[in-house]
């Protein structure tokens, strides 16, 4: 997993999606993000995201 800092712009190539990193999730292997396309706050798998 990449080490993201709160506020980092991150990118998911598989889904062509950008998000703002909000922090770690309570679940192992997940992170909290705000999706740029919808503004939705969500928890997602961390391994498919990279720094934009």
Regions found by a protein language model. Name each.
Residues 1:
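Histidine- and aromatic-rich ligand-binding microenvironments
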Residues 9-52:
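Basic/aromatic-rich interaction segments and small domains that mediate binding to polyanionic partners
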């Amino acid at each position: 997993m990449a080490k993201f800092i709160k506020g980092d712009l991150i990118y998911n190539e598989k889904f062509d999606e950008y998000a703002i990193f909000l922090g770690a999730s309570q679940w192992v292997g997940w992170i909290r993000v705000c999706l740029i396309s919808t503004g939705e706050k969500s928890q997602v798998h961390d391994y498919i995201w990279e720094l934009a």
